[in-house]
Amino acid sequence: MPLTDPNRLFPVDKRQRDLARALYDSVAELPIISPHGHCDPVWFAQNERFPNPAELFVVPDHYVFRMLVSQGVPMADLGVCRENGETGEADPRKIWHHFAKAYPFFRGTPSGMWLDHSLEHVFGIDEVLSAANAWELYDQIEGQLATAAFRPRALFESFNIEVLATTECALDDLRWHQKIKASGWEGKVITTYRPDAVVDPDFEGFIENIRAFGTITGQNVETWDGYLAAHRSRREFFKFHGATASDHGHPSAATSNLTRSEAEVLYTRILSGEHTARDAETFRGQMLTEMAKMSLEDGLIMQIHAGSRRNHSVQIFTQFGRDKGFDIPGSTDYVTALKPLLDVVGMEPNLTIILFTLDETVYAREIAPLAGAYPALKLGPPWWFHDSYEGIKRFREMTTETAGFYNTVGFNDDTRAFCSIPARHDVSRRSDSAYLSTLVTTGRMRETDAFEVAQDL
């Protein structure tokens, strides 16, 4: 019996369902464009087989292991390495067994839908993973991973991915992107400039990062001008390796518009380590404005992922480091926070700043009205905790009336779990098709327009 319903996410009403199905069929086979995510470029540079099912489904995916941790499974038992270098559980079969036993916890969640889709459509599995069949399915997947058809590049091609963007720190040497480029492989994997480590004074090792920033760029980062020049240098380096965007994961959307002398004084104070929390927020905000001005110069699209309370568990952060499933949504202001930046660049039609939020309460009140007015702003798709059927539906319902469809930017999967990419894009295409079918059947959109919008999204 298939794990996935062919009519999943479509409306119950027959007329709406038939139209949603037709809309979906018109876009289902379009190539996947993945403009923001966290896949490891080493997969495509080396094109070595994925080691085992646990390394593919569990270890890299904090959507998965955070659920298991919430049910009392120790993180180390899931193969996650500690910050001090100690390895977690090394036996992939034990990790897989934890996962199989926990599979019921994913019922009704988007992760459960993505996992079912991956097991069925990538590996041909038609039974629900459980403790009873854990070893049988493990052996089946492991056998498939040993074949050429399941190497990273082959999967990339079978997933019909047109382009995939990874995300690298400003200090990254991009060696794996260089190797991909030199390999002659035709798959398009590009990088994205993520400068958080050298623009956020609260980022661990910030001062050491700034020193390294100066070393790799040859700029005098003791000065404000030299520091900005270092960013321009790295942005150019990233562009050479395919980057089309920068990405900024800030705790808030706060921006600043300081004078040159004010910025110099603040930067000196930041480097001294004798700054306040308000100084750190002001500096992050000034750097968003500086990055926007640089985007006007070099053409990089700017993505702002604001409002995540990073590393909420001190215990997990201390033991295992960042990006371990303990980043939590927080309330986020955009109207007041973005005004300093918008006063500088908001009316620039040749600049694209994509706003993402984890605070759904601001969809209709703040970000849709902003993007529906300022030519520099676009709305990013539902992000992280909200890239689900219900999340996409809420997003469309609360933003379309004010911002329309063409002030949004389509879908991105934002994933570390490679096999979930087709599943996530499938959910997005189905969800948008369902929403469009509702607009048509309630007389708010012509059917011909709905098919055109579906293609454009």
Where are these regions (language model features)?
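Active-site loop ensemble at the mouth of alpha/beta enzyme cores that anchors a bound cofactor
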Residues: 317-329
